[in-house]
Amino acid sequence: MRLDRFTSKFQMAIFDGQSLALGRDHQYIEPAHLMVALLNQDGSTIRPLLTMLNVDISQLRSRLGELLDHLPKVTGIGGEVQLSNDMGLLLNMCDKLAQKRKDKFISSELFILAAVDDKGSLGKLLKELGLTAAKIEQAINQVRGGQKVDDQNAEENRQALEKFTIDLTERAEQGKLDPVIGRDDEIRRTIQVLQRRTKNNPVIIGQPGVGKTAIVEGLAQRIVNGEVPEGLRHKRVLSLDMGSLIAGAKYRGEFEERLKSVLNELSQEEGSVILFIDELHTMVGAGKGEGSMDAGNMLKPALARGELHCVGATTLDEYRQYIEKDAALERRFQKVLVDEPTVEDTIAILRGLKERYELHHHVEITDPAIVAAARLSHRYVSDRQLPDKAIDLIDEAASSIRMQIDSKPESLDRLERRIIQLKIEQQALSKESDAASQKRLNDICEELDVKEREYAELEEVWNAEKAALSGTQHIKSELEQARMNMEVARRAGDLNRMSELQYGKIPELEKQLDLAAQAEMQEMSLLKNKVTDAEIAEVLSKQTGIPVAKMLEGERDKLLRMEDELHQRVIGQNEAVEAVANAIRRSRAGLSDPNRPIGSFLFLGPTGVGKTELCKTLANFMFDSEDNMVRIDMSEFMEKHSVARLVGAPPGYVGYEEGGYLTEAVRRRPYSVILLDEVEKAHPDVFNILLQVLDDGRLTDGQGRTVDFRNTVIIMTSNLGSDRIQENFGNLNYEGIKNMVLEVVSQYFRPEFINRVDETVVFHPLGQENIKHIASIQIERLVNRLKEKDYELTVQESALDFVAKAGFDPVYGARPLKRAIQQYIENPLAQEILSGKLETGKPIDLLIEDEHLVTKQ
């Protein structure tokens, strides 16, 4: 008996039978061993065949186990087992049956056919289970679908549709698909193309996230509900699973074999199946090796003959890149374009999906949350499409609330972490004996007592609220199941079941749900069970960094006092501070133009008067950190070709994949302060790029992606006209100086550039009083740095006047002051600290003696 005459599945089963015999210490491989191996085999034909014959497989397994238990055990056979006489006869019988059926290879289902006529123990067992040769013959013909066994992998490629596709109509019947709201025109156009005589293959094209796959799911639901023309009724929509088709195809030709078997089975279905290929472009080039044919070319003949009813889905870019290049494949498909839905349509879609998400997360989603998700995602998430980005917001907001219910609330979690931190510190300090450590230990013990009491109270409240919330979850799940059963009964025409559900169970569950919801209505302090617009805004703020959440009282006060905050670091520039503060307030109050940046400013003035410092202060005010400022030194963009660095190199140039310096920074952090320092030093072509940013708040980078600048503050600084300011300071008022400077600026910048800037602010030169104020700020920073080293520095008024006078230079602004502080204070202090003259913990006085700065302790 030659093993290579068997199919690969049958060969594997024989080897598995041999292992089974060895494991049980049997000397011979009996038919029962092979039968058990065939039943246990993954993807075998035997199990579906026996299921078709109404055989109880678990009963068969237990009876086979009994047969094997009665076989004699032989120890010490050294791992050698042989085929028994019965087994040899059965395999020869299988060979005869294969020849009779004109098969090139012997397949595993013939073993059952041979065994049922056998007079051995397996034959008797099969007869007892009600099997006959005629019944098995009939089932084999059905499984094979009229095909002969022509190659060794024939069994693996059988029932290819079951293995390599997902039945969407079946999932629609079971209620596993999300409802499809709207998209009637696109579904109607898809049905229209499917009804054609030839080229009846629609390809659904649209941006990622607009709902292409949902259209096919909507078609499957309509077929199930009978809401389609007569020509499409009772058809099945099968989704091709490319992953399963390619996975495990190790040898050349194996992938093509699988695809061919799928196409053969589809042609046998005679048009009763619509094949859906998601990501259609993956078919072009799939399985293409050296000289072999790819999947796209294998589909062409079936598509042209109309044997294959196919619906494809792909994005615009991939359609252009893969399918349009292959004109022969493209002409076999008819395009159905899917546009992004409007905000109103998205709200309708979200209302339809609401119940599914409520059921999954066991939370309630309010209508304001749905409206906020659609509107806010449309405005602030510019690089993705509706409805996908709005659904994401709803999903994540519901998930965060569910997480807070299931795990500890954030406030409780923070308290617990703080308690652990204090306990660790307590343990460490208990080993120290010095006075400072003991003082800190007492403070920690007091704080620990307070925190532990607070934690115990909060935990009690949390447990009570959690118990109250779990009431409605069970009722909601039951109600959803009852509605699904109602739909199944409606399709089956079971009127008794329908009336029982519609007038009995469903109203009763709805009543229970209302009562449970009323019990939940009392205000909860820790847990929430509702997704509101505030949660949506919070999730969006976390995703994009743009503050769209409702302002808390503290933030309102902070914005109203914004000038005072900025004046703490920027001295003597009232106009500039006011202009910037007003722009930020307009934005946070929601009054700024949604299609332009929050504010764009051109800061003009001499060096060292606080132009760059104001930008840093603004970034610090808005984000609590100067790191969120995108600083671009325009002196680096003096050559014409350096413009490409801002938006990214064009295709074909080195660095094309890397993206632009400005565009990438804003894509990653859409809410930021952009400082274009020394803007007049840049090449004039740079300003042409800035025109779109200042007017429309958008810029297209080197890769064709639109970058959104609508949530940025753009500040450009320049020294233009600073000589005029110095000459006329004191002679003219602010307006007069401003007009003179703008005259110089208009000669340098184009009118269309100046016209797009929201406000041009001219900075004042700094006077003696301003310099003194700045000196006190900078010395205060030095005092704080020394405090960290345990030195207490006190600066006398006379010393402050001395430094301010030494650092005053009307031409260079505040920068000479920094040098004066270094020269007169920091350098002598550093020397005295290093030489050991100054001791820690004792006060140090900085004062004037004989017109010199001296330190005394």
UniProtKB/Swiss-Prot annotation:
Cellular component terms per the entry's GO annotation? cytoplasm
Q: What is its main location?
A: cytoplasm
Gene3D superfamilies given for it? 1.10.8.60, Clp, N-terminal domain, P-loop containing nucleotide triphosphate hydrolases
Question: Which portions of the sequence form the region Linker?
Answer: 341-545
Residue ranges of region NBD2?
555-765
Query: Which ranges of the sequence are coiled-coil?
Result: 391-525
Stretches the record annotates as C-terminal: 766-857
The record's note on quaternary structure and interaction partners says: Homohexamer. The oligomerization is ATP-dependent.
Name under which the protein is recorded = Chaperone protein ClpB
Q: Which gene encodes it?
A: clpB
